[in-house]
Structures are given as structure tokens and as C-alpha cells.
UniProtKB/Swiss-Prot annotation:
Name the UniProt record assigns to this protein: Aspartyl/glutamyl-tRNA(Asn/Gln) amidotransferase subunit C
Cystine pairings recorded for this chain: none
Keyword vocabulary terms for this entry: ATP-binding, Ligase, Nucleotide-binding, Protein biosynthesis
Function: Allows the formation of correctly charged Asn-tRNA(Asn) or Gln-tRNA(Gln) through the transamidation of misacylated Asp-tRNA(Asn) or Glu-tRNA(Gln) in organisms which lack either or both of asparaginyl-tRNA or glutaminyl-tRNA synthetases. The reaction takes place in the presence of glutamine and ATP through an activated phospho-Asp-tRNA(Asn) or phospho-Glu-tRNA(Gln).
E.C. numbers: 6.3.5.-
Subunit structure, as described in the record: Heterotrimer of A, B and C subunits.
Catalysed reactions, as listed in the record: L-glutamyl-tRNA(Gln) + L-glutamine + ATP + H2O = L-glutaminyl-tRNA(Gln) + L-glutamate + ADP + phosphate + H(+); L-aspartyl-tRNA(Asn) + L-glutamine + ATP + H2O = L-asparaginyl-tRNA(Asn) + L-glutamate + ADP + phosphate + 2 H(+)
Pfam families the UniProt entry points to: GatC
GO BP, one annotated term: regulation of translational fidelity
A single GO molecular function term of this UniProt record: asparaginyl-tRNA synthase (glutamine-hydrolyzing) activity
Keyword Membrane: no
Source taxon at top rank: Bacteria
Family membership: Belongs to the GatC family.
């Protein structure tokens, strides 16, 4: 696939980028180089490559899922205009 100056103008317009006439030819070359590289990638045989999410295999440590009260519910409820029974009291919004 080859990019012409009209395509560069259209892409610049869609990206809301102001491009001068002098910049069109260099951008055309850069876009053609990028597309040539993508075409090379499309031709690679990756049938035997396992899917991955990153280059370096990493596992994040999981912590135990424990429910707590936050260790300071009184301080949290002190920020509320009204509280009752350990909960925020809010105005009724649905009849």
C-alpha cells in the first residue's frame, strides 16, 4: 500500500493536525515506511508463538482478600454531615 499526498492531507485533517505543503512529502515518506514495516509484520509466521501480554513473564503477588472495617470507621463517619448505625445518612432521592 502506498500513501500519496492527498492521503497525508486527509489523515492530518482527521487527526486535526495542521500540515504545511513543505511537510507533506517527508510525512508521505514516513507513513510509507511505517506501512511497509506493518506489511512485514503481517507476513511473519507466528503459528508456533504462544500469545503473551508482555515480553517478560511476570506474576504479581496476590494478597489475601480480607474484609475489614477500614480500621478507623469513626474518623470516616466524622466527615459525614449525618451518620446513623455506622452508615452515612443521605437524603431520599427516589420516592
Amino acid at each position: 500500500m502506498s500513501v500519496d499526498q492527498a492521503t497525508v492531507r486527509r489523515v492530518a485533517h482527521l487527526a486535526r493536525i495542521a500540515v504545511s505543503e513543505e511537510e507533506l512529502e517527508p510525512l508521505k515518506g514516513e507513513l510509507n515506511a511505517i506501512l511497509a514495516f506493518v506489511e512485514q509484520l503481517a507476513n511473519l509466521d507466528v503459528a508456533d508463538v504462544e500469545p503473551m501480554t508482555g515480553v517478560i513473564p511476570m506474576e504479581l503477588p496476590m494478597r489475601e482478600d480480607v474484609v475489614t472495617d477500614g480500621h478507623y470507621p469513626e474518623k470516616i463517619l466524622a466527615n459525614a454531615p449525618e451518620a446513623e448505625g455506622g452508615f452515612f445518612t443521605v437524603p431520599k432521592v427516589v420516592e
